[in-house]
UniProtKB/Swiss-Prot annotation:
Topology class, membrane: Multi-pass membrane protein
Native source organism of the sequence: Mus musculus
GO terms for MF: zinc ion transmembrane transporter activity
Subcellular location: Golgi apparatus, trans-Golgi network membrane
Protein name: Zinc transporter 6
Main location: Golgi
InterPro entries: Cation_efflux, Cation_efflux_TMD_sf, CDF_SLC30A
Length: 460
């Protein structure tokens, strides 16, 4: 028998949790207007679908899909209000802003799928064109146009407003902009109305209604039923062309990419951070788009051992917070320690190598195989990149001395420094050995025996 829990907390189902969150959003006064428009949208969509069936017009069906898209935009607006109410949780430490992006991406993709469905149905109608009844065609056009414009202009939809401005222009906007420039050249007073970038949703609503009006007139005058199919194809292409740039932009945000227009600003800020007092190196910087208009990022900063961590952290955060809203900065102190070398004479028993005093040569990587550790150059006073961030000897294997005694630091040799470029041509150089002398397996400049022998007498 299993353990009996008398006071077990009841587990809510998925729909129970969804209903609880919906009640949380519905309690806000700002969402009442959206819920009212959503109810009217469902009612209008039902009437439009019935009129599409009675008129047998596929062009009106394609235009009705824009009303369904308005319903998705209202749902996205509700999700935006819900995101503002919720705080980050341990599971979702960055918050729920990405749900807005996901809602916009799903809405635009569904609109494009509806446009593809209209194109498929229109291709079938070209083979056998049915008769179109114009009784409710014009009425349905004006009902759908009025509701779409009223919804777009009355509800402040923050996610779609941002995407429509940030995404690239559609081909419909470009053609209308060209016509507007030509018209404003003739009538300059219209420049304040037509020259600014038009709202793509309002533009497609007006263009679709214009196509349906032409369809109604041609069918009433000449019984030219094929124009209904042509109008449906035109509305579907305009819908696809309008939604495609928005879906591409929101998809890039979901893929956690960096917007191209802020890459130059981020590079400038990184260079400014690398010149701050106490900062030796900036590495592993990574920035991505968290939501619409918000960036997140992380960066590793290596500082001097005598630098104040809190002061450097405050300066770095102050520089980057102008662009990056959610920033993680990790501070590392410099771990490069040079041994203190004395300039006195060498003691007679400083080193006691074995009889053969063989030092195995370390394995060195080729210059081509080395990869840069950081994207920002280190300062001249900083240590080499092999000793960065507690990874000493990343590219060079350590040298093992085959004697049992501990090597003292007071060698009494002249302190020199061999640049990294000479390591591959002259052999490995150690700190404390002259700059022009490296250690090789044969040791041509070192006597074969030195120190004291086993009897305590100096060796020759």
């Amino acid at each position: 028998m299993g353990t009996i829990h008398l006071f077990r907390k009841p587990q809510r189902s998925f729909f129970g949790k969804l209903l609880q969150e919906f009640r949380l959003v519905a309690a806000d006064r700002r969402s009442w207007k959206i819920l009212l428009f959503g109810a009217i949208n469902v009612l209008c969509t039902g009437f439009l679908l019935m009129w599409c069936s009675s008129t047998n017009s596929i062009a009106l069906t394609a235009y009705t899909y824009l009303t369904i898209f308005d319903l998705f935009s209202l749902i996205t607006c509700l999700i935006s209000y819900w995101v503002m109410m919720r705080k980050p949780s341990p599971v979702y430490s960055f918050g729920f802003e990405r749900l807005e992006v996901l809602a916009v991406f799903a809405s635009t993709v569904l609109a494009q799928l509806g446009a593809l469905f209209i194109l498929k149905e229109s291709a079938e109608r070209f083979l056998e064109q049915p008769e179109i009844h114009t009784g409710r065609l014009l009425v349905g056009t004006f009902v759908a146009l009025s509701f779409n414009l009223f919804t777009m202009l009355s509800i402040r939809n923050k996610p779609f407003a941002y995407v429509s401005e940030a995404a690239s222009t559609s081909w419909l906007q470009e053609h209308v902009a060209d016509l507007s420039r030509s018209l404003c050249g003739l009538i300059p007073g219209l420049s304040s109305i037509f020259l600014p970038r038009m709202n793509p949703f309002v533009l497609i609503d007006l263009a679709g209604a214009f196509a349906l009006c032409i369809t109604y007139m041609l069918i009433e005058i000449n019984n030219y039923f094929a124009v209904d199919t042509a109008s449906a194809i035109a509305i579907a292409l305009m819908t696809f062309g309008t939604m495609y740039p928005m879906s591409v932009y929101s998809g890039k945000v979901l893929l956690q990419t960096t917007p191209p227009h802020v890459i130059g600003q981020l590079d400038k800020l990184i260079r400014e951070v690398s010149t701050l007092d106490g900062v030796l190196e900036v590495r592993n910087e990574h920035f991505w788009t968290l939501g619409f208009g918000s960036l997140a990022g992380s960066v590793h900063v290596r500082i001097r051992r005598d630098a104040n961590e809190q002061m450097v952290l405050a300066h770095v955060s102050n520089r980057l917070c102008t662009l990056v809203s959610t920033l993680t900065v990790q501070i590392f102190k410099d771990d490069w320690i040079r041994p203190a070398l004395s300039s006195g004479p060498v003691a007679p028993n400083v080193l006691n190598f074995s009889d053969h005093h063989v030092i195995p040569m370390p394995l060195l990587k080729n210059v081509d195989e080395r990869t840069p550790v950081t994207s920002t150059p280190a300062k001249p006073s900083s240590p080499p990149p092999e000793f960065s961030f507690n990874t000493p000897g990343k590219n060079v294997s350590p040298v093992i001395l085959l004697n049992t005694q501990t090597r003292p630091y007071s060698l009494g040799l002249n302190r020199g420094h061999t640049p990294y470029s000479s390591v591959f041509s002259q052999g490995l150089a150690f700190p404390g050995v002259g700059a022009g002398q490296g250690l090789r397996p044969t040791f041509p400049h070192i006597p074969s025996r030195y120190g004291i022998n086993r009897m305590g007498q100096p060796r020759p």
